[in-house]
C-alpha cells in the first residue's frame, strides 16, 4: 500500500485547531506555590455531604432542584435557566447555537476574559475585537462600526481582569444597537460581589440578552464546574438543542442544589462580606507599598495593580511560592498583575513579600 499521501495525526486535525493557542488557565500555567492567588477562587474549602447515591442511573438533563433553586435565587422563571459545566460551556453553547462557522463573527472588548476568543476559534467562528476605552468602558462607536456580521457580543461585567463594572447606560445603548441583529452576552461571573448591578431585570425588555453565571467564585465551588445561562425561554430552548444530554453528574447536581438552598445562599453572602473586607485591607496595604504604582478599583474578589517592575515582582513572588496572575500581555495592561483576595494570612504574605522588593 502506498504511503505517499499518508498524513500524520496532526495533519488530520482541522487547521484552526492545529494553530490554536489553548486558554492559559491558572492550572495550565502551573507553579509550585502554597499561596494560590491567580485563579479568583475562594481561598478556603466549603464542605457538603452527598445525599444522592443513585449513581447507576443517568442524571437529569437539567436537574429540577438545581434549576428551581437557581431561578428563585436569581429572580427569574425556571424556564429562563440552563445549567451547564461551568459558565465556560455556556459561552460555547451560545456561539454554537447562533454563529455559522466561516460566516458569522463574535465581538468582544479586550482586555477581558480569554475564553470568548478561544471558544470561537475552536468552533471556527471569526473573532472581532473592539478594545475598551482608556477607562476600560465600552467603545460604543467602535462596536457599532464592527457589528455587521457579528452575531454575538460578549461583555464581562464586572470585567475580568480589570475588576470594574461596565456603565449600565452603555449596556443599554449596546442592547439597543444590537436589537434584531445580535445576541448580547453579559458575563456576570463575579456579580455576587456587586449584586445590585445584575441585568436579570432587563431580560423582559431585551429578548436578545443572555446572562452567564457561575458557582465557581462567591459560592466557593470552582472544583464543581457548575454554571448557568439566564435568558428568555426562546433562547434557552435553542441552547437545549446543542447541549450534551447529561451535562451535570449526579454528585455535582446534588451539591449545587445544596449550595443554592436558603442556608447555602446565606453562607455565600457571608463569604462575600468577608471577601469585601479582606479586599479593602489588601487595597489599603498595596497603596502603601513602594513597588506598586497604582491600585485599580475593584467590584470583585481580585485586585488589579500596576507595578514598577512587574515581571521581576511576579517571578520573585513565584519563587517564594506566592502565585499571582501576570496580565502584562493583555492590551493596555502593561506592568499589571492580578491578585485574588485570599485569607488574611495569605494577603499579609503578599504584602510582606512586595515590601521586601527592591525599588
UniProtKB/Swiss-Prot annotation:
SUPFAM superfamilies assigned to the protein according to its UniProt record, in alphabetical order: PLP-dependent transferases
PROSITE patterns linked: AA_TRANSFER_CLASS_2
Entry's Gene Ontology molecular function annotations: histidinol-phosphate transaminase activity; pyridoxal phosphate binding
UniProt key word Transferase: yes
Pfam family, one: Aminotran_1_2
Keyword entries, A-Z: Amino-acid biosynthesis, Aminotransferase, Histidine biosynthesis, Pyridoxal phosphate, Transferase
Protein name: Histidinol-phosphate aminotransferase
Species this chain originates from: Salmonella paratyphi B (strain ATCC BAA-1250 / SPB7)
Phylogenetic placement of the source organism: Bacteria, Pseudomonadati, Pseudomonadota, Gammaproteobacteria, Enterobacterales
Gene that encodes it: hisC
